[in-house]
Design a protein with these regions (language model features):
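Short linear motifs at protein or domain termini
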Residues: 1-55, 169, 173-177
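Short alpha-helical transmembrane interface motifs in multi-pass membrane proteins
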Residues: 31-32, 124-128
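Short functional linear motifs
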Residues: 32-35, 62, 154
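Conserved amphipathic alpha-helical segments that form helical-bundle/coiled-coil interaction surfaces
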Residues: 50, 55, 59-126, 139-148, ...
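Solvent-exposed loop and edge beta-strand segments that line ligand/cofactor-binding
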Residues: 130-134
């Protein structure tokens, strides 16, 4: 029981669950307003991390991005028996791809905040799947981001990552309203 309380306390500190006095815990609400603020913060931090990674990254970093993109593009997006549910192998490969993009960033605080924002956005990403499958080419979005980053084109990379994130936000917001 102590381990469960500790886990719930940690999830509460991360904003994923809400503690209710004398009533236990509930999963934090999702809302278009929360998603818009989260996306705004995430885009700003992600772009800063990308800028630093592009400035500092070398051949190993580029190789890691190409490998992560290859892995992601060869991983099933949704569950074979339920196309409305993300395949957890894809979720892991997606996380690794986005981590690889910024892995050459040398500011650990920016990376830490980026990781927290990524984790927060995951629950919204899960919501986007049944709403958007036909109207978006996520694989092409990832290729565009990787191409811009490896080309060291900061403006194009920042625009591509922002578009990628705001597209998810738009899809979820439409579904929530």
């Amino acid at each position: 029981l102590g381990a469960v309380r500790e886990a719930l306390s940690k999830l509460s500190a991360e904003g994923l669950v809400d503690a209710r006095a004398q009533r236990g815990y509930t999963v934090s609400d999702v809302s278009p307003e929360d998603l818009a603020e989260l996306t705004d913060a995430r885009v700003r931090i992600e772009q800063e991390c990308l800028k630093l990674a592009i400035e500092k990254g070398g051949l190993e970093w580029e190789t890691d991005i190409v490998a992560a993109l290859h892995r992601l593009s060869h991983t099933p997006y949704t569950m074979p028996d339920d196309p409305a549910v993300l395949d957890q192998r894809w979720v892991k490969a997606h996380r690794e791809f986005h981590r690889a993009l910024v892995s050459a960033c040398d500011n650990r605080w920016l990376l830490r905040i980026r990781g927290q924002l990524y984790d927060q956005s995951e629950r919204y990403r899960q919501l986007s799947v049944p709403l958007a499958r036909a109207e978006r080419d996520v694989a092409q979005e990832h290729r565009n981001i990787a191409d811009a980053v490896i080309a060291r084109d900061v403006a194009r990379a920042c625009a591509a990552i922002a578009s990628h994130m705001w597209t998810t936000t738009q899809i979820v917001t439409t579904g929530l309203t």
